[in-house]
Amino acid sequence: MKLHKKIAAVMLCAALLFATACGTAPAQEQSATPDSSTPTIRFLLRGTASGMDRVLDALYAQMDDDHRWQLDFTFVDSGDYAQQLARSLTAHDNYDFVFDAPWQSLAMQTEQKNYKNLKNYFNNPEYPALQAAFSEEYLAANTISGGLYAIPFTNTYYDVPGIFYRKDLLQTLGLPFDEITNRAEMEQYWAAVRKKGEMKPISLGSRGFYQYNLPEITLRQNGIWVSQGWSFWDYPSQILLSSDGKQVLDVVFPGDSNEHFAALPERYQTNFLDVYLQQNAADSQWLSPDDLLQENGARVFLLGQSASYEASLASGTGQVQQQLRTIVPEGEVAFWAYDDAFLPQNRAQGSIPTTYAAWNDLCVPSYSTNTIEAMRFLDWLYSDWSRIDLFNYGVEGTDWQVVGDEEYTLLQPMGESFRFPSYELAWNPQHHRIDTALPDAEKALLEFTFDQSSYAASPLAGFTLNTTPIAIEIAGLNSLYAEYYTAFGHGAYGAQTQEKIDELHTRSEAIGLETVRAEIIRQIQTHLDKNSAE
């Protein structure tokens, strides 16, 4: 079989070993055992990877004559991935699996019939490992119009967002605390870093402050939800449900009038979406102008050039710290979850409302002629959790070591360290490990999110917005908001923020905002009525 390397034009389309190239750049081959009869499974994924040669060697060593494939990965830098995916699907590029997500283009691509319905491959005894790893309930929560057009990947039903920060740096700043536990302490830390003048207080990526000023789980606990099927980041909106979950009270947008909110029940009368964008503007004092151009705030942090960055917890601070120490040997990384719903005293059974929908997926292009072979590979991959561990942690004994039944420790391999966007292939609610070196508080937070009893089903579970009746309006709104997205997310409008919110709302009304509002309300109420009747 052949292994190939692909290098992206922008950053690093892959730090990998596989064939072809981003766009039309020539491929660079690397040695491997050639076998032209071996089926090839081709992936188009988002992000970067390293240390994959040894991972694939270990994976190939487990294959036999009846289960043998050559894997070919194309990695595209996160900032360019959405456009590359659209181009590849339009051009019918030869991929068997492509990454997509509800927050990216999953609903749109599905409605355009660009993905295959994979329902027959799951809950199917001919694919026993997939049947075991993907429960019927989990799949049901991830269907679109009754079909399974995306294979859902999540290691937990909520990945906690927060701020990764330099704990070693904090301890040199003379502040009266040695860890960050609230917003006031975080701002004191940023202020002290700025005063010292050696690095940026925080580096943000393309998603800006993300949920820092709009804590999602706290909102859910108060009956406020985003719509599955139309990403909040394509155009911000929130669904307001009654306290019993049986009625949709409204769908609200930035720029809705104060009178609009005043007509709602008391707990919804704050124009919280405007407040969210205004708070982003207030917090922009901590940013540098070039943050608007950064795709990933972690890169600046890992180079030792910023004191913090915003991201979701994923597997914890361990791998982040390992990468930082290649540049900053004394670096120590900690994490603060900025949603108060995750304070230790607020954690309880059923305290995380969820739809059980995954936020990352693999899809099979509708034109693929290799689907059976691709699904055979996926079934084989999931037939042994040790294979999944390869894509989560690297090679055991080189990159990591088992500790007990559910923990692991990271090792320092010779050469490049392992890195792979495992959320695109190897996350599953049934299989977890926790880095044994993590602080006890961080372990406890991960254990809480891994525990399925921490979750409670939302009345919106199983609902996905059918955008077909409002496709023209939503396309127009998405295109319009793209003009504002980066500046709103980073607070770059400053004192002009409210003016820009009002401008967005006026322009949105002209291209169908009220039509969209009415249709979302209608569809959700139909869903809630169906729930009540069952």
Residues of each region from the PLM?
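Extracytoplasmic/secretory soluble proteins
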Residues: K2-L3, L12, L16-E534
